[in-house]
Amino acid sequence: MTYTATIRLYDETELDLLRPDPSKIAIDHIAIALSREGRYANQGRLVYCVAEHSYLVAAGCYSFARDVFDKDQEVFRLLQLRALFHDSGEAYLRDLPGPLKKLPAMAFYREI
């Protein structure tokens, strides 16, 4: 039996989460989705979206990397991008609260 897990994105693009086509993954999909997705299962005292979190991680990484990797611009840029996009998968697969993610029954989710 073949399963699909297709979702429709804001621009009507469809993406199969089990067999994602890289050509259908776009930076605007990521930016829009992460700006609408709250951290901490939306249970924080303040609204704190994943996009803001990603930006703050990248800004902190920039400060650190500037001092450590300033002479190696290639590593510096890659580290900044990695920091900015570290939660980009959440644009397509929502994040689960940590305690739930750790359950053995959720191994399939971690695999995806």
Across the structure, where does each feature detected by a protein language model lie?
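Metal-dependent phosphohydrolase cores
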Residues: 1-112
